[in-house]
Curated annotation (Swiss-Prot):
Disulphides: none
GO molecular function, one term: 5S rRNA binding
PANTHER family to which the protein is assigned, alphabetical: 39S RIBOSOMAL PROTEIN L18, MITOCHONDRIAL, LARGE RIBOSOMAL SUBUNIT PROTEIN UL18M
Protein name (Swiss-Prot/TrEMBL): Large ribosomal subunit protein uL18
Function: This is one of the proteins that bind and probably mediate the attachment of the 5S RNA into the large ribosomal subunit, where it forms part of the central protuberance.
InterPro entries, per the entry: Ribosomal_uL18_bac-type, Ribosomal_uL18_bac/euk
Subunit field text: Part of the 50S ribosomal subunit; part of the 5S rRNA/L5/L18/L25 subcomplex. Contacts the 5S and 23S rRNAs.
Pfam families xref list: Ribosomal_L18p
GO CC, one annotated term: cytosolic large ribosomal subunit
Length: 119
């Protein structure tokens, strides 16, 4: 049976394996996603400078009614896409953070795509 520690270690290993291949630039930043038990976080990162360009999460105001379920994840995706488009960023590289592309992670990605991000 998997213990929580085993799952988090497996996720970290998956993330490091994927991060060897995924790299964000100023023109095409990395859309990094983190999912906790209570919230979901997304940020656009320029790996060359090591800076976060745009960030959004379900812990911000206005998410009390939705929370961090699939609906909340989709709203976070739309919100990060709107903020990115305001800064002139349309193309991104998706970094699922070692999480399986399913459920809340998938909804966040679909919400970002619907709002205009290209990945």
């Amino acid at each position: 049976m998997f213990k929580k520690n085993d799952r988090s270690q497996s996720r970290t290993r998956r993330h490091m394996r994927v991060r060897k291949k995924i790299f964000g630039t100023a023109e095409r930043p990395r859309l990094s996603v983190y999912r906790s038990e209570k919230h979901i976080y997304a940020q656009l990162i320029d790996d060359v400078e090591g800076k976060t360009l745009v960030a959004a999460s379900s812990s911000e105001k206005g998410f009390d009614s939705v929370g961090s379920n699939k609906e909340g994840a989709k709203l976070v995706g739309k919100m990060i896409a709107e903020k990115a488009l305001e800064k002139g960023l349309k193309k991104v590289v998706f970094d699922r953070g070692g999480f399986i592309y399913h459920g809340r992670i998938k909804e966040l990605a679909e919400g970002a795509r619907e709002a205009g991000l290209d990945f």
